[in-house]
Amino acid sequence: MSCCGCSGGCGSSCGGCGSNCCKPVCCCKPVCCCVPACSCSSCGDCKGGCGSCGGCKGGCGSCGGCKGGCGSCGGCKGGCGSCGGCGSCGGCKGGCSSCGGCGSCGGCKGGCGSCGGCGSCGGCGSCGCCQSSCCKPCCCQSSCCKPCCCQSSCCQSSCCKPCCCQSSCCKPCCCQSSCCAPVCCQCKI
């Protein structure tokens, strides 16, 4: 019998089902395996489409990496985002926004926030954001960054009013405004 337009039947001369075939086995089936829309079910949604008889072509596209990881044949699972690819964190979890990739906190969790790489981890905490410059706007929210919040670079902004008067950490800047009246206004100079 003919298979997907192969005049030679199901033997070795059939030559496969052509560029529209998305199944590893094309011939010798009761139902024609060639379909108009390429599904690439065996390779995890190839970005570049399917080759002949189930193979992937195009790989992960031009963005430099897959959002969600790659399948075993080089295809993208979930497509590619605009973040420039996935780094050593093993894939962007939830997708990347415009942060430029995955930071050291184990991936962009639910997208990247304004902190510059650490999304829903709050900006601070175990991912090490607090020691870099990315958390100045947010490091005094809740109790995430009390150890580093009173550094001069943070204290001079408005982010540290709730915590910058602990002990003597902020004497040089504490007396600005009224953030530190109970403790630090002895530092008038």
From Swiss-Prot:
Entry GO terms, CC: intermediate filament
Cysteine-cysteine disulfides: none
Region (8 X 4 AA repeats of C-C-X-P): 27-182
Superkingdom per UniProt: Eukaryota
Keywords: Keratin, Repeat
Residues in Sequence repeats: 21-24, 27-30, 33-36, 134-137, 144-147, 159-162, 169-172, 179-182
Family of the protein in this entry: Belongs to the KRTAP type 5 family.
Function recorded in the entry: In the hair cortex, hair keratin intermediate filaments are embedded in an interfilamentous matrix, consisting of hair keratin-associated protein (KRTAP), which are essential for the formation of a rigid and resistant hair shaft through their extensive disulfide bond cross-linking with abundant cysteine residues of hair keratins. The matrix proteins include the high-sulfur and high-glycine-tyrosine keratins.
Quaternary structure (record): Interacts with hair keratins.
Protein name stated in the entry: Keratin-associated protein 5-2
Species of origin: Mus musculus (Mouse)
Phylogenetic placement of the source organism: Eukaryota, Metazoa, Chordata, Craniata, Vertebrata
